Amino acid sequence: MTDPIADPVVPDTLAEPRLVVEPGVAARFAAVAEPVLQAMGYRLVRIKVSGEAGCTVQIMAERPDGTMLIDDCEAVSRALSPVLDVTDPIDRAYRLEISSPGIDRPLVRSSDFARYSGHLVKIEMAVPHQGRKRYRGLLDGVEGDAIRIQREGVTKDEDPLVLLPMHDIGDARLVLTDELVAESMRRGKQAERELKQSLGLAPPPPPHAKRSDPKKSSAPKPKPLTKPVVKPDAKPKPKNTKQHRLAADRLRRGDTDLSEGD
């Protein structure tokens, strides 16, 4: 069977730079893997090198719509393995793993934050922002070079909305929720259906069918977390009914010192 190739996309989408890049050995693997992935229509998400004796190199990749099927992983492995054998980025034996980013995936590009707006995220800043390094809350989209977060667990004196500069983010990933699992399943089924159609294993979609927009999330738009507003009563209640009655009696008697006798 022909290896799956991701759908043709605008080159700028594949070449969009990552906000967080790996240092050291992982960076050498990234330099080799990224051009191969882009040529196949995939994007590099993250590379992790773990273990000393039994070294494992995990390469996370995805289609531009955020999906990655088993067939995709196998195709990438077959294309990338011989290239890595020639370039030899590491001086010891290792085991290569090609995987999808997973449901609670890392967010590594500006488009990731836009796509998963409305989902719960946790952020660790490389540079502290407003005296904090860790944030958790609803992702509320992108604003220029920053992301908007509706923070969880804020006090009544704190503003829940915070803007975090993207270039200061050290790590960002989705938090596993029921809504995220449901959307991930929807995306996976859509990608599998489109793959079968492209390989001729399933009938093509009807002409009027609309393709899902990979840049958009089906998650509900986050509602702004506003501070509680205390509304005044329609009719002010007397603070001391007895005091008011005594004051009224003194007024009727012509007394000028209304505090006398309280």
UniProtKB/Swiss-Prot annotation:
This is Ribosome maturation factor RimP. Required for maturation of 30S ribosomal subunits. The keyword Endoplasmic reticulum does not apply. It holds the Pfam family RimP_N. Belongs to the RimP family. GO terms for cellular component: cytosol. Residues 185-262 are annotated as: Disordered. It comes from Rhodopseudomonas palustris (strain BisB5). Residues 185-196, 246-256 have a biased composition (Basic and acidic residues). InterPro entries: Ribosome_maturation_RimP, RimP_C, RimP_C_sf, RimP_N, RimP_N_sf. GO terms for biological process: ribosomal small subunit assembly; translation. It comes from the Bacteria. SUPFAM superfamilies: YhbC-like, C-terminal domain, YhbC-like, N-terminal domain. It is found in: Cytoplasm. Its main location: cytoplasm. Keywords: Cytoplasm, Ribosome biogenesis.
